[in-house]
């Protein structure tokens, strides 16, 4: 039960970071923090119920998150090269 509370706290910290911060890299790190909190909850629930499904789901979420990191950082770097800023407000550059 303690791990589920910890996962909820970590998820809340990540959600607050996404809502409050304007820097794209910080927002990206907060989204990754939220994904890791979900992984912790999956593993904690799997441990409580004696199954392995939560661990398998957590593994697949980590694989997808690794691909997300590659694509997300490439987009952030392209915005930074164009504007010399990593602000979320500069993300509308990609529309043109």
Swiss-Prot record:
Tell me what reaction this enzyme catalyses.
Answer: a quinone + NADH + 5 H(+)(in) = a quinol + NAD(+) + 4 H(+)(out)
Its record classes its membrane topology as:
Multi-pass membrane protein
Q: Please tell me the species this chain comes from.
A: Thermobifida fusca (strain YX)
Q: Return the NCBIfam families for the record.
A: PRK05715.1-2
Report what the protein is called: NADH-quinone oxidoreductase subunit K
A Gene Ontology biological process noted in the UniProt record is: ATP synthesis coupled electron transport
Which domain of life, per UniProt?
Bacteria
- Residue ranges annotated as transmembrane are 1-21, 25-45, 56-76
InterPro entries for this protein: NADH_UbQ_OxRdtase_chain4L/K, NUOK/Mnh_C1-like
Q: Where in the cell is it found?
A: Cell membrane
| Function in brief | NDH-1 shuttles electrons from NADH, via FMN and iron-sulfur (Fe-S) centers, to quinones in the respiratory chain. The immediate electron acceptor for the enzyme in this species is believed to be a menaquinone. Couples the redox reaction to proton translocation (for every two electrons transferred, four hydrogen ions are translocated across the cytoplasmic membrane), and thus conserves the redox energy in a proton gradient.
Recorded GO cellular component terms are:
NADH dehydrogenase complex; plasma membrane
**What GO MF annotations does this protein's record show?**
NADH:ubiquinone reductase (non-electrogenic) activity; quinone binding
Q: What is its main location?
A: membrane
Gene responsible for this protein: nuoK
What are the record keywords, sorted?
Cell membrane, Membrane, NAD, Quinone, Translocase, Transmembrane, Transmembrane helix, Transport
